UniProtKB/Swiss-Prot annotation:
<feature type="topological domain" description="Cytoplasmic">
    <location>
        <begin position="296"/>
        <end position="563"/>
    </location>
</feature>
<feature type="topological domain" description="Vacuolar">
    <location>
        <position position="274"/>
    </location>
</feature>
<dbReference type="GO" id="GO:0033644">
    <property type="term" value="C:host cell membrane"/>
</dbReference>
<feature type="topological domain" description="Vacuolar">
    <location>
        <position position="58"/>
    </location>
</feature>
<keyword id="KW-0812">Transmembrane</keyword>
<dbReference type="GO" id="GO:0140222">
    <property type="term" value="C:pathogen-containing vacuole lumen"/>
</dbReference>
<feature type="transmembrane region" description="Helical">
    <location>
        <begin position="59"/>
        <end position="79"/>
    </location>
</feature>
<comment type="similarity">
    <text>Belongs to the chlamydial CPn_0065/CT_288/TC_0561 family.</text>
</comment>
<feature type="transmembrane region" description="Helical">
    <location>
        <begin position="37"/>
        <end position="57"/>
    </location>
</feature>
<comment type="function">
    <text>Interferes with host cell cytokinesis, centrosome positioning and Golgi distribution, and contributes to the morphology and stability of the pathogen-containing vacuole. May exert its effects by acting directly or indirectly on host microtubules.</text>
</comment>
<feature type="transmembrane region" description="Helical">
    <location>
        <begin position="275"/>
        <end position="295"/>
    </location>
</feature>
<keyword id="KW-0964">Secreted</keyword>
<keyword id="KW-1043">Host membrane</keyword>
<dbReference type="GO" id="GO:0140221">
    <property type="term" value="C:pathogen-containing vacuole membrane"/>
</dbReference>
<feature type="transmembrane region" description="Helical">
    <location>
        <begin position="253"/>
        <end position="273"/>
    </location>
</feature>
<protein>
    <recommendedName>
        <fullName>Inclusion membrane protein M</fullName>
    </recommendedName>
</protein>
<keyword id="KW-0843">Virulence</keyword>
Length: 563
């Protein structure tokens, strides 16, 4: 997972500026360190000297030499304290910049790519990209009014064309961030078509992780014109500032010396000297800061700073960096835009494909359930039919034709039967049975061989003794009668059959539509794979252009340092 510390400073070109003029401590860090140690030692000695002066005056010792020593000690302490404060401030800024460099993603985004490769779940994948996009959005690729004025002085007649490219860079970067934020929304359809573990989508996210990580790691340190700070001192202004700072320091020393000479040597006046020295030191410090601020924001300093940049870096290096930055962001923006268009165009097909696939799965489950219920109901009908046949077959069979004829006449003359349809079926069955018996007796059997028992059962569907069914009529309901005599299905079986036919028709229609949609979805999947190859090319191009920009930034700083 990609985590960033809370309240982490922004990675932006302004954090890694082009230093137009390095100070003495930057050029000679070892000497500056020795001076800081000396200042700390002087501050400690000055405090000891002041304490010694107070004790000596209280004891009635030599006041004037001790007062002079105390004044010098106080002044040395003040200067040492000011030096320590400035050094600590600069050391803190350098430490902050080092922390920023350490917090940048590793080369080629190894940790993020490894994470995505080992854990490809949906939420973690998008959370990782979201964290990287949030960090990328902190890069500020805009130029404020003072820097624009400085660039206008540096570039001269080329300013208008280069400024147009700079504005396009800012606009492309903003649009690119917007597309990155909307990617998850664009890929809702493809995620449903090939959920989460799909190689094309995983590869695209992995490539985009590499691109964003490289941008976060290298773009802030390859800012070019975005790394320039207008409110810095030019060479001439820095010289003037140094002269004024030394003059004010000497003035404070002279003031403290005057106080020591003209004030009487007593304990209260030593306190006055100390307070006055402190006040003069604070006033000197504030005046120095005010002079520096005025010099940094003066038009004269801006013109001199522009001349210094023209002499050292020159407009060609800055223009080249603008060109490569424009090429980098234009290529990334166009690649992401093409990817978004492809994903948005394919989204309805993928969503419809996923919905239809889910519908087919649901209909298949319904079909299996209904088919099982239908077969079970058929088995129950067959068991009931066999049971009813056995019940009808158990009734006594008539011994002669006269009894049969009597029984037939009784059945034919029965007008009070509650089930006329059943009676009609019985009558038809009896007629068919008599006809069959007559034909069978005349062709195959003699009267002696005729057995009433053999020809007493009519078999329309099963072994039914229809001549005796009238006796069990009262024991069968309508559904059982139909089941027994007409090979009819029960009401439950009929319902299952109707539902099964309906689901079968819906399933066939869905499968037919799915076969057509599958081709379109495969075409869209191919286009998505093409977008993956485009992102791979964009990743290589991004790495190449960022390396070029980094080398140009180092060249610009080298030219500034060796001026």
């Amino acid at each position: 997972m990609v985590y960033f510390r809370a309240h982490q400073p922004r990675h932006t070109p302004k954090t890694f500026p082009l230093e137009v003029h390095h100070s003495f401590s930057d050029k000679h860090p070892q000497i500056a360190k020795a001076m800081r140690i000396t200042g700390i030692a002087l501050a400690a000695l000055s405090l000891l000297a002041v304490v010694a002066c107070v004790i000596a005056v209280s004891a009635g010792g030599a006041a004037i030499p001790l007062a002079v020593i105390s004044g010098i000690a106080v002044m040395s302490g003040l200067l040492s304290a000011a030096t320590i404060i400035c050094s600590a401030k600069k050391a803190l800024a350098q430490r902050k910049q080092k922390q920023l460099e350490e917090s940048l993603p590793l080369d080629n985004a190894t940790e993020h790519v490894s994470y995505l490769t080992s854990d490809t779940s949906y939420f973690n994948q998008w959370e990782s990209l979201g964290a990287l996009n949030k960090q990328l959005s902190q890069i500020d690729l805009t130029i404020q009014a003072p820097e624009k004025k400085l660039l206008k002085e540096v570039l001269g007649s080329r300013y208008d064309s280069i400024n147009h490219s700079i504005e396009e860079i800012s606009d492309r970067f903003t649009k690119m961030l917007s597309l990155l934020r909307l990617r998850e929304h664009f890929y809702r359809g493809e995620e449903r078509y090939a959920p989460y573990l799909s190689p094309p989508l995983l590869n695209k996210n992995r490539l985009l992780t590499q691109i964003t990580s490289n941008m976060i790691r290298m773009l802030p340190k390859s800012g070019g014109v975005f790394s320039l700070k207008a409110n810095t001192l030019s060479h001439a202004s820095r010289t003037l500032y140094t002269v004024l700072k030394v003059a004010l320091s000497l003035g404070v020393l002279a003031g403290v010396a005057a106080l020591i000479i003209f004030l009487p040597p007593s304990l209260p006046f030593i306190a006055v000297i100390g307070v006055s020295s402190l006040a003069l030191g604070m006033a000197s410090f504030l005046m120095i800061r005010g002079i520096k601020y005025l010099l940094e924001h003066s038009p004269l300093n801006r013109k001199q700073l522009a001349k210094d940049i023209q002499k050292t870096i020159g407009p060609d290096v800055l223009a080249s960096m603008v060109h490569y930055q424009h090429q980098l962001l234009s290529h990334l923006h166009e690649t992401l835009l093409d990817e978004a268009i492809t994903a948005r165009w394919s989204e309805p097909f993928f969503i419809e494909h996923a919905n239809l696939k889910a519908k087919i799965e649901d209909l298949t489950k319904q079909y299996d359930i209904l088919n099982a219920a239908f077969n079970k109901s058929l088995q129950q009908d067959e068991a009931l039919r066999s049971q009813l046949e056995k019940r009808a077959y158990l009734f006594p069979i008539p011994n002669n034709d006269e009894n049969a004829k009597t029984k037939e006449s009784q059945l034919l003359d029965s007008e009070n039967d509650s089930n006329s349809e059943f009676q009609e079926i019985i009558n038809k069955g009896l007629e068919a049975a008599n006809k069959r018996r007559a034909d069978a007796k005349s062709k195959f059997y003699t009267e002696d061989e005729t057995s009433d028992k053999i020809f007493s059962i009519w078999k329309p569907t099963k072994n039914l003794a229809l001549e005796d069914l009238w006796r069990v009529h009262e024991a069968c309901n309508e559904e059982q009668q139909a089941l027994l005599l007409e090979d009819y299905m029960s009401y439950k079986t009929s319902e299952c059959q109707a539902a099964l036919q309906k689901v079968s028709q819906e399933l066939k229609a869905a499968q037919k539509s799915f076969a057509v949609l599958e081709k379109h979805a495969l075409d869209r999947s191919y286009e998505s794979s093409v977008a993956t190859m485009d992102l791979a090319r964009a990743n290589q191009e991004t790495h190449r252009l960022l390396n070029i920009l980094s080398e140009l930034q180092q060249l610009a700083q080298y030219l500034l340092d060796n001026h």
